[in-house]
Amino acid sequence: MLNLYTLPAVEDGAFENFCGGNLGGEHEACIDVAAVPGAVEAFELRDSKPEGAGQKLRVTAAEVDDFVLGWAKKRGLAL
């Protein structure tokens, strides 16, 4: 399996954010996501909160899909 952490950095402008709650500001409770350059269907997720600055997770599309479907099912959410 390709080591996603060896691929180039994601530019800040490439991130899209998904927000909810907004505990302390406009983008305080967001998860940002962007495609990883040089990879097919790989993504970087990061925390938008100041305390989470610099914390990043790289995952494949299959890993994100599995998480999203499992999370929605566990929480009783409809897709």
Q: Which positions does each model-derived feature cover?
A:
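Negatively charged, low-complexity tracts enriched in Asp/Glu with abundant Ser/Thr
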Residues: 1-24
